Amino acid sequence: VLSTKELPPTPEGLVELERKKREEGPFGFVKDIGVAIVEMPRGLKKMALVYLFQWYAMNVFWQYLGLMCAVTYFGVNLSDPGYAKTEAFNDASGFATGLMVAYYVSCTVVALYLARLANRIGPKHVHTAALCLAAVCLVLLTRIGSPGHTAVLYLPMIGIGVAWASITGVPYIMAIEMIRKERRGVYMGVINMM
């Protein structure tokens, strides 16, 4: 932000924007979004499908991490009506919070370097590797620890954090390469809706 030079619109560009606003009315942006979705480049349509699955997977992960830890590593029995009030469940919840800290820290650190890596080897390769890493780490999360040895679970959480850094940034790098310069704004909004 500090090193990016702002390019203000030209007077002619401002006149054109005002004309377009008058012609399209207050809801012209809805038409613009609809046209963008219909005319979406094939690569972005493929990305939309990937987004569907990655966001679903991450939502399931966020919702069930604590329960998975409770059942798999802390011996909580979900059929017990008072399981949420047990000490084991509280311990599992605290442990899951610690895992999420590792996830967020790794995501933050990796995000600082991911764009450079994507520029060097290509965003498609970086994102594919990150999603594969996430898949492996999600499986490992339920397989590599044991009730007495839960510290090893921080390793897959770091991998999932790496994937999250990619999920929240690299698709925009890929998209910018597919979109005409004058349509970038609307398509960035469409990607945010995915």
Predicted features along the sequence, with ranges:
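Loop-to-transmembrane helix entry/capping segments in MFS-fold secondary transporters
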Residues: 93, 179-191
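C-terminal ends and interior cores of transmembrane alpha-helices
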Residues: 132-147
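Intracellular juxtamembrane helix-capping segments at the cytosolic ends
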Residues: 166-180
